[in-house]
């Protein structure tokens, strides 16, 4: 007796690709609606010198949530200039005071380093995604209606290599109103979460009742 043949339909169903999970579909939709903004971080870029006498630098980029900022480091091709004439930068994220004074010690932290001006594969590129939430412990979260600041470390010869700085404004979304810019670092004395703040406030009437009894 011939062996029974297995139905082909279940086998064909196993070969069909599975649909992506919901979070993957949301990520793809956000990527499709995002824009990319390029910044060429070198002293020859005239946008770094626009309005330099007003607030310490007029280079401003406006982005929306889920947009990308691409930083392109200085790059040199053959014939290479002398090593001392190549631009090297350490980029920091700072608060408003650090941006105005071009001082990375004003509550700033190192973000990227442009240290390969003669890289054979082209200029170094660093990308910042302006997202509300990040799954990475070392990632940074951004808020609509806020300003964020980037500067490069001031070199010893400030005449030959002026300070470069950038202001990024995150546009408010339809669900948010404009909020005044705040420092990129929050105080350790503030509540770490809305739930914790509500819990603390809810205990105040109980404490007053116990003290008055």
Swiss-Prot record:
Q: Which family does it belong to?
A: Belongs to the ephrin family.
Q: What is this protein called?
A: Ephrin-A2
- Which residues, by range, are in coiled-coil regions? none
Attached carbohydrates are found at: 42, 174, 188
Q: Where in the cell is it found?
A: Cell membrane
Q: Which UniProt keywords apply?
A: Cell membrane, Disulfide bond, Glycoprotein, GPI-anchor, Lipoprotein, Membrane, Signal
- The answer to whether UniProt assigns keyword Calcium to this entry is no
Q: Start and end of every Ephrin RBD domain?
A: 34-174
What InterPro entries does its record include? Cupredoxin (IPR008972), Ephrin (IPR031328), Ephrin-A_Ecto (IPR034252), Ephrin_CS (IPR019765), Ephrin_RBD (IPR001799)
Membrane-topology annotation of the record: Lipid-anchor; GPI-anchor
GO BP, one annotated term: axon guidance
Briefly, what is this protein's role? Cell surface GPI-bound ligand for Eph receptors, a family of receptor tyrosine kinases which are crucial for migration, repulsion and adhesion during neuronal, vascular and epithelial development. Binds promiscuously Eph receptors residing on adjacent cells, leading to contact-dependent bidirectional signaling into neighboring cells. The signaling pathway downstream of the receptor is referred to as forward signaling while the signaling pathway downstream of the ephrin ligand is referred to as reverse signaling.
Q: Which residues, per the entry, are lipid-modified as GPI-anchor amidated asparagine? A: 188
Classify the main location. Answer: membrane
Statement: the UniProt record of this protein carries the keyword Signal: yes
Listed GO CC annotations? neuromuscular junction; perikaryon; plasma membrane; side of membrane
Q: Which residues form the propeptide?
A: 189-213
Alphabetized Gene3D superfamilies for the sequence:
Cupredoxins - blue copper proteins (2.60.40.420)
Q: How does it assemble?
A: Binds to the receptor tyrosine kinases EPHA3, EPHA4 and EPHA5. Interacts with EPHA8; activates EPHA8.
User: What S-S linkages are listed for this chain?
Assistant: 73-114, 102-163
Tell me the leader sequence span. Answer: 1-24
Q: Which GO terms describe its molecular function?
A: ephrin receptor binding
């Amino acid at each position: 007796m011939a062996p029974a043949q297995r139905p082909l339909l279940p086998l064909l169903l196993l070969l069909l690709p599975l649909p992506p999970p919901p979070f993957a579909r949301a990520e793809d939709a956000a990527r499709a609606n995002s824009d990319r903004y390029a910044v060429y971080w070198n002293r020859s870029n005239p946008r770094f010198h626009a309005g330099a006498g007003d607030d310490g630098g007029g280079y401003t980029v406006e982005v929306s949530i889920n947009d990308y900022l691409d930083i392109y480091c200085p790059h040199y091709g053959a014939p290479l200039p002398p090593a001392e004439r190549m631009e090297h930068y350490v980029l920091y994220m700072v608060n408003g005071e650090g941006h105005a004074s071009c001082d990375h010690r004003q509550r700033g932290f190192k973000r990227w380093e442009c240290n390969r001006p003669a890289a054979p594969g082209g200029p170094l590129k660093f990308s910042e995604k302006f997202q509300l939430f990040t799954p990475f412990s070392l990632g940074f979260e951004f808020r609509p209606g806020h300003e964020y600041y980037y500067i490069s470390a001031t070199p010893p010869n400030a005449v030959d290599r002026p300070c470069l700085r950038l202001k990024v404004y995150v546009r408010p979304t339809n669900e948010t109103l404009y909020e005044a810019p705040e420092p990129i670092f929050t105080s350790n004395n503030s509540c770490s979460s809305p739930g914790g703040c509500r819990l603390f406030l809810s205990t105040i009437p109980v404490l007053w009742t116990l003290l008055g009894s």
